[in-house]
Swiss-Prot record:
Keywords: ATP-binding, Kinase, Nucleotide-binding, Transferase. Substrate binds at residues 31, 43, 54, 79, 142. ATP binds at residues 8-16. One of its GO terms (molecular function) is deoxynucleoside kinase activity. It holds the Pfam family dNK. Belongs to the DCK/DGK family. Its EC number is 2.7.-.-. It comes from Invertebrate iridescent virus 6. The active site is at 78 (proton acceptor). This is Putative kinase protein 143R.
Amino acid sequence: MTIICIDGIIGAGKSTVTHRLKKNLYKCYEEPIDKWTLLPNLYNDMKKYATPFQFQVLFSQYDQYLSFKDCKETVVVERCPWTSKNIFTSLMIENNLFDLSAIDTYNNLYERLSYQVDHFIYIKVDSEMAFERIKKRDRFAEQNISFDYLKSLENKYATSLATLSPSTVTIIDGSNTIEEVEFDVKTAINNFLSH
């Protein structure tokens, strides 16, 4: 099985692209946000909810993995445990939002529950565009996302993706139309699978 991860900051267009790919017969798994009962609370009080929320995300991603682990086809996931640990949890630790006494437990669980991604497709948009998209779609759980938080995510992705082998990451311009982004993502998937 080959696992490809669609990634990007909040508001990049990951969910829209993943949903469109699913309609085109790709085996896709969107972020299991329906299991993230702590998400609405997170942006209201990050200090209180960051740690339990990141555990909740990790467990939900593992549950999702169990549903496709025996699949023989190529699987496309929206975000993955690597993102949870290296982007969101890492950023929360840097900002003193993650309970330091839980880091070892989180890392141990991550080692047991994470899975290997073969290729990342990063939909790149700047934080200004992402912020406008978030305001426009007006999701309840995202009402308190700050521009500064998006900017810090954008920077964190830039530094974290740079640690991966360049052959495992494709960067797509997410400022294009959704049709163009979808086309570019499909092209990236096909290029990766043909090598």
